[in-house]
């Protein structure tokens, strides 16, 4: 599913639907009232959250989904497959400080020297792939 904060573009805008070849209609979307606050709902349901931010001390390839508690200081249930939500911000400003703080982990994508950022879609694709192969 995709959780959208109030500042996100409309995923059902005509051009979005067209460039996604209609696949946007197959992905569940949720409109959050307040992203930092609504992340607690994910945590309450056992879903850990990883904020992608270039300033994170940990690199994405170092994140072990099985070692992430659903909330900071929480316990880890090793009997279940880890459930992780990747949290990304807008291109340019990135995530807000309150959103980064609300996440249970922070990670950065390692990039070549001189590259300071990635397109949000590219960053998310890399993160989802990395977490999938890490399982």
Regions from the language model: what does each represent?
Residues 1-135:
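Post-transcriptional modification and biogenesis factors for structured RNAs
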């Amino acid at each position: 599913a995709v959780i959208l904060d109030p500042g996100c573009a409309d995923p059902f805008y005509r051009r979005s639907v067209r460039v996604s070849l209609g696949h946007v209609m197959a992905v569940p979307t949720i409109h959050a009232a307040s992203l930092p606050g609504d992340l607690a709902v994910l945590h309450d349901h056992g879903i850990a959250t990883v904020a992608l931010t270039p300033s994170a001390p940990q690199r994405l390839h170092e994140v072990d989904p099985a070692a992430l508690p659903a909330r900071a200081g929480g316990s880890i249930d090793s009997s279940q497959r880890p459930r992780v939500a990747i949290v990304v911000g807008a291109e340019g400003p990135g995530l807000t400080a309150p959103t980064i703080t609300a996440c249970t982990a922070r990670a950065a994508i390692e990039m070549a020297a001189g590259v300071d950022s990635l397109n949000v879609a590219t960053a998310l694709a890399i993160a989802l792939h990395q977490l999938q192969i890490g399982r």
